[in-house]
Curated annotation (Swiss-Prot):
It comes from Neisseria meningitidis serogroup A / serotype 4A (strain DSM 15465 / Z2491). The lineage of its organism: Bacteria, Pseudomonadati, Pseudomonadota, Betaproteobacteria, Neisseriales. The keyword Disulfide bond does not apply. Belongs to the complex I subunit 5 family. This is NADH-quinone oxidoreductase subunit L. It catalyses: a quinone + NADH + 5 H(+)(in) = a quinol + NAD(+) + 4 H(+)(out).
Amino acid sequence: MNDMTLYLIIALVPLAGSLIAGLFGNKIGRAGAHTVTILGVAVSAVLSAYVLWGFLNGSRAKFDENVYTWLTMGGLDFSVGFLVDTMTAMMMVVVTGVSLMVHIYTIGYMHDEKVGYQRFFSYISLFTFSMLMLIMSNNFIQLFFGWEAVGLVSYLLIGFYFKRPSATFANLKAFLINRVGDFGFLLGIGLVLAYFGGSLRYQDVFAYLPNVQNATIQLFPGVEWSLITVTCLLLFVGAMGKSAQFPLHVWLPDSMEGPTPISALIHAATMVTAGLFMVSRMSPIYEMSSTALSVIMVIGAITALFMGFLGVIQNDIKRVVAYSTLSQLGYMTVALGASAYSVAMFHVMTHAFFKALLFLAAGSAIIGMHHDQDMRHMGNLKKYMPITWLTMLIGNLSLIGTPFFSGFYSKDSIIEAAKYSTLPGSGFAYFAVLASVFVTAFYAFRQYFMVFHGEEKWRSLPEHHSDGHGEEHHGLGKNDNPHESPLVVTLPLILLAVPSVIIGYIAIEPMLYGDFFKDVIFVNADAHPTMHIMKEEFHGALAMVSHSLHSPVLYLAIAGVLSAWLLYVKLPHLPAKIAQAFRPVYVLFENKYYLDALYFNVFAKGTRALGTFFWKVGDTAIIDNGIVNGSARLVGAVAAQVRKVQTGFIYTYAAAMVFGVLVLLGMTFWGLFR
């Protein structure tokens, strides 16, 4: 099998499974739908692992070829092609591996769904195909296709329960917010096409960069900026939408309206990593603009810290994990801004495993609670759901950066990158990611203690209480006990727990300090020496653990865990008093910094008001009633006046004739004697 065939199979097999499940779902049934989609993703996962292994043992070389030319227009070729290198191979394994776990898990989680079972499997398999096309692309056109495809499928999946108003609102919100980011992304691609050599293929664009190194572009009359800086910022606007960076992050928490498996897939391995992958892939461009990198770093720092604060007050078990995703995406963005692209991609990988684990473990707890998602109704689930308890503990330990867990190696590396960066804004970024360590540990173990320890709070609730999640989410009765989830749910948890512990230790040296990303990621070491300094400081994974004993990071994490234990295990009455004492801050967090209100009341309502103005004033009053109907009325009015002259009496016509003759005579004499 040649390389082209291999890569086509990896990309297209999930699409084939999606089409079969979607078009023939009623004929093949539920078992047929999940079998064909799982088989397709499993084939892709195995072949992706084979490709990655080839890169690791040196038997596989970088592949960059076009599959076919889609369109030729004005000397410009729009092609479909694959660029498969070490970064692509790593992402292929992450995407297909996590997707496979999600597919298997979905069999148990969606077991009781009466309708839409086949449709859901079709969607998640299509989601996998879309992400593969994005990461395997060798040109901006295919990148944009995958970019829009993951956006479309996420819209369908977030709104899977389309009869719920909250779900339809959430998927429309995600779609519209991402359109804002995509508009900037499209403008950036337009600049690349117009000024970077007239090609959209990555290798051609990168080769042309020296020709535009000092080029400027006029933004406004008398205002010129660096062409590369403007291009980088516009491309990053797209990343802000897809990877949910402040202030385009507001769609991500509401994506929890979709079923839990798709929450795991969106947050761990697909849509939210697209923007981070794109910036890393475009490292040769970004390395030419320190201004753009500073902006990226500051935005990532704001996202990491301030989204973490919002996770502290959440009571929905899935929303806690959602806000942790926002915060962790901020960490990765800080790494990008510090020119530590390899560190960002390393955290993308480790985060994918432990975040998928956390979401799926949360879903398992939700199953045990009869689909009640409110943590205030849980407690002591450790007694009833030991596998879910242990795997969520592992996920949280990795999330907060506990030594020897995967998240420790990647998260601490990001903090070190911010520390060593010399760009403007790096001081704020270092403070933000450092403070986020405490915040992350606090909300992660607040969730853990509320769910798995303490009193069994559902026993004090009314029977079949309403928790605001719809009729099917009725919760446990007073005398009911939670139950451990079936093997089809717990097996993916166990399998994801393994890389959540060991993958960081295995991968840190080759990915960050070896040559894994050689010739894939470009860093201008003279202008941005962060990685060069970190390489000198790194003496091995175990030495990194030893170094953490002298770092504030470990002690901030411990302080966060102890604070959560004190407030939610030893003194559970205290959080309510603290919230009351700091009521203004709590209300600010509860309203998510009022950004949703700003967007809804100013931008959404403002746009509708502007549209209403143009409709009523511009279209109806000026065009319809003014120009169109007004001209008709004018003709009618003139005709009505002229009609009065047509009386039918001879003396009227004679008087008109005499008047006309007098006018003509007057004009004649005026001309003669003037």
